[in-house]
UniProtKB/Swiss-Prot annotation:
Major place of residence: membrane
Keywords: ATP-binding, Cell membrane, Kinase, Membrane, Nucleotide-binding, Phosphoprotein, Transferase, Transmembrane, Transmembrane helix, Two-component regulatory system
Role of this protein: Required for cell division and growth. It catalyzes the phosphorylation of CtrA and activates transcription in vitro of the cell cycle-regulated fliF promoter.
SMART domains: HATPase_c, HisKA
UniProt PTM: Autophosphorylated.
Source taxonomy: Bacteria, Pseudomonadati, Pseudomonadota, Alphaproteobacteria, Caulobacterales
Designated name of the protein: Sensor protein DivL
EC number per UniProt: 2.7.13.3
Gene: divL
GO cellular component, as recorded: plasma membrane
Organism per entry: Caulobacter vibrioides (strain ATCC 19089 / CIP 103742 / CB 15) (Caulobacter crescentus)
Length: 769
C-alpha cells in the first residue's frame, strides 16, 4: 500500500467516524422530536405552559416550539436559564431567540430559514458568557429549537454540531447512502454538487452524485466490504477525477468519501504521455536502444534493437535478462569473438555496479560489422545501452583518407608554389612550382629536410628574416592562434610581389603556398589610378553642372518674377500680355529643366534620399490632374483620372512620385493633338501598385522605344530631354521600374510599377541579381 493510499484510508476513516456520529445524532433528534410533539400535546391539553408538570423544567436542554412568530418553551426551564445566561439575555423565550439572532448575522439567516421555510440547522452560538448548542428542525406546522449550554470544561469535546460542521468543512463530497445507493444525508460539498436544497433525505430524493458511484455503493452494501473506484465526474461544469471510497456502516447504510485526485491523474496522464512520447521517439531513431531494469531484465527496446540483432519480438516481450540476451546472441555468433566468454560476460554485467560515466566500446562482429556501444546508468535504475552500426562510417573514413591523398597529389600540379611541413617541421610535400619559384633543385630540398634547411635555400631571393621567423611559428608552434590561417604579401629581392598563404591541415601539418602576383598588382594599380581619374572627372562634371545650374537659376527667378508682375500690370495690351506670358512660361520651363538636371546629377552621385510616407494613390492622381489641367485645356485635350477604389495607400516619397507623374503627363499632353484624351489610372496587382499614364496621341516609333528613357533623347520641342530619364531614375529609387506600351498612330501608355511597401534608398539592381 502506497503512502497515498494510507493517507486516503485515514481520511476516509475520520470522515466515516464523523458520518457515524452524525447519523447517531440524526436518530437522536428524530426521537426527541417525537417526544416534543407528545409533550406539546399534553401541554395544550393542560391549558398552557403555566400548568405544565414541574419535571419539564428539569431538563438541561431547552426545547422551544415556534409557530406564527410566537415562541413557547416546551421543556427545559433550567436549560433556558443557562442558555440565557451564556447569551447575556433575559430568561425569557422570546429574549433568548432574539439574542440568538443578534449574536451573528449567520445565526439570524439560519433561524429565518428554519421559521419560514422549515430548513433544518445545527450550529453553536457564541455569547458574551459562553457557548450554546443550537439545533433546529421543522415538524408539521411547528419549528422546534433545541438549546443546550456547553460547559467550558467540555467546550473542546466533539459534539454533534461540531461533527456536522467538520464534515461540512470537507471540500470533497461525503454522504451516507442506503443499500439502494440513494443518498439519505450529505455534507455541504455533496449538497452543492447534486444541487439539493438541504442535506436531509427528503431533499436528496432522486439526487445522485454519479450513477457509477451509486453502483459502487450498492456493491459495498451488498457484499458488506469496503469498495474503491476512480470516477471522472462533471462538477460545476468541469470534469474532475475522484477516488471513491464506500464503507458499510454499523447499523445500516454506507458512508461514502470522495477525494479529488484530478491533479494527480493529470500528472499521471502527462507522465504516461511523456513516457510514450519518449518511447516513440526512441523507436524512430536508427540506433538500437535497450533499457535494462535494476533486476537486469529488459524493460524497453526499440524496433532497431530487434532488427539489429535479429531477435524475435515475442521472445523480447517476455523480458529476458541481460545475461540471457548475451547468451542468445553468442549462440547466433553475433557477439565479438573472445576466448573467455564467461569472463567477458561477467565483466559486461559488472557494469551495473559502476554508476559513473562509462567509456564507449567498439565491437567487431564475425559478420564484418563494427558496432559502437554506448552505456550509461538509467535515471530510474538499471542501464541504457545504445548500439550504433558504424561500419559504413569507417568505410567512408577510409575513402576520405584516400581522397585526401588524391587531393594532395592534385596540389602537386598547381601553378602556385606549394609546400607541406609536418608539426615537427619536416618537409613532407612540395610541387614542381615550388622548385621553380625559389630556383632550387629537388635534390637540394631533399637534403634540406626541415623548415630551417628550406629557409636557407630561399633566403637569397627573400632576405626578410622576420618573415621567415613568423612563418616558422605557423609551422611549429602548437598554439591554436599561431596555427590560424594567415595570408599576406612580401617583396622579393628581384622586385617580385609574392602572395603567401598559410593553412593548417587536419593531421597537424601546415600548408604554405606562394604565388607571384606582380602583374596582377600592377594591373590593379593602373585600374585604381584610372578609376580615381574617372571619379575626379565625374566630380568636376557634377560640380560644373551644379554651379552652372545655380548660376542660371538666379536670372531665371528674376525673369519669372518680373514676368508675373507685367502680366498683372495695367495698361499693357493683350498682345503684350501674351508675349509676357510666353516669356514666363519659357523661363519656368527652363527652371524646371535645370531642376531636372540637378536631380539627375544628385541621383548619379547617390545623394538623393527618399522621404518615405503613406500616400493615398487617388490623391496623387487627382493632384497631378489639377496641376496639368490648365495646360490640357489650352491644348484642347481631355485629362481624366480613373482609380480603383481598393488601391488605397502606397509607401513612397510623395514629392518625387508627384514629379514623376508631372513629367509623364507633360509628355502625354505634348504627344496628344487637340481633341485627344490623356488618362491617369492606378490599380493594385501582384504585390505592387501600377500607375498608368496613357494618351491617344501619335505614339512612339518602334526604333525610338528602345531608347525612350535614355538621357537627352531629342523632343519635338526643345529641352534637354531629361524628363523620361528622370522618371525612370525616380521610380527605380522606389524599387520599381517603368514600362512603355505604344504602337505608332494608336497612342502610348507609360506604366510605373511600384512595390506596395518601400524602404528609403531602395533601388532595383540593373541586372536583376
Amino acid at each position: 500500500m502506497t503512502s497515498y493510499d494510507l493517507i486516503l484510508a485515514a481520511a476516509a476513516g475520520a470522515v466515516c467516524l464523523a458520518i457515524s456520529v452524525a447519523l447517531w445524532s440524526h436518530g437522536q433528534r428524530r426521537n426527541l422530536e417525537a417526544r416534543i410533539v407528545a409533550l406539546k400535546t399534553r401541554l395544550i391539553q393542560q391549558g398552557g405552559s403555566d400548568d405544565a408538570p414541574a419535571w419539564l423544567d428539569a431538563f438541561d436542554t431547552a426545547v422551544i416550539a415556534v409557530e406564527g412568530g410566537r415562541a413557547n418553551l416546551v421543556a427545559g426551564g433550567e436549560g433556558l436559564i443557562a442558555c440565557a445566561k451564556a447569551l447575556g439575555a433575559d430568561a425569557e423565550v422570546s429574549a433568548v431567540v432574539a439574542a440568538l439572532s443578534d449574536a451573528d448575522p449567520n445565526y439570524a439567516q439560519k433561524l429565518t430559514a428554519l421559521f419560514e421555510r422549515g430548513e433544518p440547522c445545527v450550529f453553536e452560538a457564541r455569547g458574551p458568557h459562553g457557548l450554546v448548542s443550537v439545533e433546529g428542525r421543522a415538524a408539521g406546522a411547528l419549528a422546534w429549537l433545541r438549546l443546550a449550554p456547553i460547559d467550558r470544561a467540555d467546550s473542546g469535546l466533539p459534539t454533534a454540531a461540531r461533527f456536522a460542521a467538520f464534515v461540512d468543512s470537507v471540500v470533497e463530497p461525503c454522504w451516507i447512502a442506503g443499500a439502494d445507493g440513494q443518498a439519505i444525508w450529505g455534507n455541504a460539498a455533496f449538497v452543492r454538487a447534486v444541487g439539493a436544497a438541504s442535506a436531509q433525505a427528503p431533499a436528496l430524493a432522486g439526487k445522485s452524485f454519479d450513477r457509477g458511484a451509486d453502483a459502487v455503493v450498492v456493491e459495498a452494501a451488498g457484499k458488506g466490504e469496503r469498495r474503491e473506484a476512480l470516477r471522472w465526474i462533471n462538477v460545476e461544469g468541469r470534469r474532475r477525477a475522484f477516488r471513491l471510497s464506500a464503507q458499510p456502516l454499523d447499523g445500516g447504510g454506507v458512508g461514502v468519501f470522495c477525494a479529488d485526485v484530478t491533479e494527480i491523474e493529470d500528472v499521471r496522464d502527462a507522465f504516461k504521455k511523456h513516457v510514450e512520447a519518449h518511447d516513440e521517439t526512441l523507436n524512430h531513431i536508427a540506433e538500437a536502444v535497450a533499457i535494462f531494469s535494476q533486476t537486469r531484465r529488459l524493460s524497453y527496446h526499440n524496433t532497431a534493437f530487434a532488427e539489429l540483432w535479429g531477435l524475435e519480438p515475442a521472445w523480447l516481450a517476455d523480458r529476458p535478462t541481460h545475461g540471457e540476451v548475451l547468451d542468445r546472441l553468442r549462440q547466433r555468433r553475433r557477439l565479438p569473438e573472445t576466448i573467455d566468454y564467461a569472463g567477458w560476460k561477467a565483466a559486461e554485467l559488472a557494469r551495473y555496479e559502476d554508476l559513473g560515466p562509462q567509456a564507449d566500446d567498439l565491437w567487431d562482429l564475425p559478420d564484418g560489422r563494427t558496432l559502437k556501444v554506448v552505456r550509461q546508468p538509467h535515471p530510474l535504475g538499471g542501464m541504457l545501452l545504445i548500439y550504433s552500426d558504424i561500419t559504413g562510417e569507417l568505410r567512408l573514413k577510409a575513402q576520405y583518407n584516400a581522397l585526401i591523398q588524391v587531393q594532395q597529389a592534385t596540389l602537386d600540379k598547381l601553378n602556385d608554389a606549394v609546400a607541406v611541413f609536418g608539426s615537427d617541421g619536416r618537409l613532407r610535400l612540395h610541387n614542381e612550382a615550388f622548385e621553380t619559384f625559389w630556383n632550387v633543385t629537388p635534390h637540394a630540398l631533399e637534403a634540406a629536410g626541415d623548415f630551417e634547411g628550406v629557409v636557407e635555400l630561399c633566403v637569397p631571393r627573400l632576405h626578410d628574416l622576420s618573415f621567415w621567423r613568423e612563418l616558422k611559428g605557423r609551422v611549429a608552434d602548437p598554439d591554436p592562434q599561431m596555427r590560424a590561417p594567415t595570408s599576406g604579401e612580401v617583396r622579393t629581392s628581384d622586385s617580385r610581389i609574392v602572395l603567401y598563404q598559410s593553412r593548417p591541415l587536419p593531421d597537424g601539418a601546415t600548408l604554405i603556398a606562394f604565388a607571384d602576383v606582380t602583374d596582377t598588382r600592377d594591373l590593379q594599380s593602373a585600374l585604381a589610378d584610372r578609376s580615381a581619374a574617372l571619379a575626379e572627372a565625374e566630380r568636376l562634371k557634377r560640380d560644373f553642372v551644379g554651379n552652372v545650374s545655380y548660376e542660371l537659376r538666379t536670372p531665371l527667378t528674376t525673369i519669372i518674377g518680373y514676368s508675373e508682375l507685367l502680366e498683372r500690370a495695367d495698361g499693357i495690351s493683350e498682345r503684350g500680355r501674351n508675349h509676357v506670358a510666353a516669356v514666363r512660361a519659357a523661363a519656368t520651363q527652363l527652371a524646371r529643366s535645370i531642376d531636372d538636371v540637378l536631380d539627375m546629377a544628385q541621383i548619379d552621385a547617390g545623394e538623393m534620399a527618399l522621404e518615405i510616407e503613406d500616400i493615398r494613390v487617388s490623391d496623387l492622381l487627382l493632384n497631378a490632374q489639377e496641376r496639368a489641367l490648365k495646360d490640357a485645356q489650352l491644348g484642347g485635350v481631355t485629362l481624366a483620372v480613373e482609380c480603383e477604389e481598393d488601391v488605397g495607400l502606397i509607401r513612397g516619397d510623395g514629392k518625387r512620385l508627384a514629379q514623376t507623374l508631372d513629367h509623364l503627363v507633360e509628355n502625354a499632353l505634348r504627344q496628344t493633338p487637340p481633341g485627344g484624351r490623356v488618362t491617369l489610372s492606378a490599380r493594385r496587382a501582384l504585390g505592387e501598385v501600377r500607375l498608368d499614364v496613357s494618351d491617344t496621341g501619335r505614339g512612339v516609333p518602334f526604333h525610338v522605344q528602345a531608347h525612350i528613357f535614355d538621357r537627352f533623347v531629342g523632343r519635338d520641342r526643345g529641352g534637354p530631354g531629361l524628363g523620361l530619364a528622370l522618371v525612370k531614375a525616380l521610380v527605380e529609387l522606389h524599387g520599381g521600374w517603368v514600362a512603355l506600351e505604344s504602337e505608332p498612330g494608336n497612342g502610348s501608355t507609360f506604366t510605373c510599377h511600384l512595390p506596395e511597401t518601400q524602404q528609403p534608398g531602395a533601388m532595383q539592381p540593373e541586372l536583376g541579381f
